[in-house]
């Protein structure tokens, strides 16, 4: 506990919180161009081929983003929108591709949880 004298001499130091998504530079989403689209394997107890892409953002940052959902149409030079959100079993992947925005199509034949995968309501 500080004395009043100490508080008069030195004010309290604010805790500085570090951003989990620095490349977004305080924006909710950022646009970028795919420089490489590839698959990678997850950390130890899990096994799969996760679809990821390397993205050069409009602010100059180069980041790795995860492509969620079954199947995608991304290739080099595709223009995409990314959001924050890490993938726990892929080290270094802190961003997600937003499906259904710009060049990235929504997931085909998706019926449930459509809003997360850029799919319109099915006409009956």
UniProtKB/Swiss-Prot annotation:
Record family assignment: Belongs to the universal ribosomal protein uS12 family.
Organism this protein belongs to: Buchnera aphidicola subsp. Cinara cedri (strain Cc)
UniProt protein name: Small ribosomal subunit protein uS12
Organism lineage: Bacteria, Pseudomonadati, Pseudomonadota, Gammaproteobacteria, Enterobacterales
In-chain residues carrying the UniProt-annotated modification 3-methylthioaspartic acid: 89
The protein's assembly and partners: Part of the 30S ribosomal subunit. Contacts proteins S8 and S17. May interact with IF1 in the 30S initiation complex.
Example of a GO MF term: rRNA binding
Keywords assigned by UniProt, alphabetized: Methylation, Ribonucleoprotein, Ribosomal protein, RNA-binding, rRNA-binding, tRNA-binding
Function field: With S4 and S5 plays an important role in translational accuracy.
InterPro entries xrefs: NA-bd_OB-fold, Ribosomal_uS12, Ribosomal_uS12_bac
GO cellular component labels: small ribosomal subunit
Signal peptide: none
